[in-house]
Amino acid sequence: MTTIKTTVILFFALVINMAAAPAFAIQLDLMPGTQTVAPADTASLDIVISGLGAGSAPSLSSYDLEITYDDALLTPTLVNIGDPGLGDQLDLFGLGSIVSVTPGVGLLSISELSLDLPSDLDLLQADNFILASLTFTTLGVGNAAVGFGNVILGDSFGLPLAADVNGATIAIRNPVNGVPEPMTWALLLPGLAWLRGRRFRV
């Protein structure tokens, strides 16, 4: 009987703790959500994560993202890893992380793996920050959608994290003064890059 009572007490204690635990709604956004630029101009987007723990778990130790875009209207030219104000939050002490940027047709794959300790990530990582900043060159006139394909996020121990995602739209418009559309550029994209730098020309 004592064993049964103990089991019941532990069960209800677990339920109460789960109910009291904070709920984290992790989100990935491409920001700004909308912008207007001219043909043969550049457009920049930030990949922003929010909803992580503030000085506690969950934190982010890895991500593997597919960024989809309209290759008839856009071509990626630059990827900057990390937050320009906070620094790379997966490389808290500047000791390096494992980064990959792989361009493809209408697809840009970006991944990073932190080498920091789980306890450091949980305690010191910001609860929202920029993962990477993307720069595109515009090729024509129209509305270019940029979004997320496959998304894999790992917490400080590498366990999966779920997140809601929101894409962006780049409106490409001719100047109102009627200047003829400039000739578009055709850029050759390099292959896989395993680098520790923080800037990637694609």
Residue spans for each PLM region:
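Low-complexity, serine/threonine/proline/glycine-rich extracellular segments that form mucin-like
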Residues: 33, 38-93
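Structured beta-strand segments within beta-sheet-rich domains
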Residues: 46-51, 57, 88-142
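A short, hydrophobic C-terminal helix/tail in secreted or cell-surface proteins
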Residues: 180-198
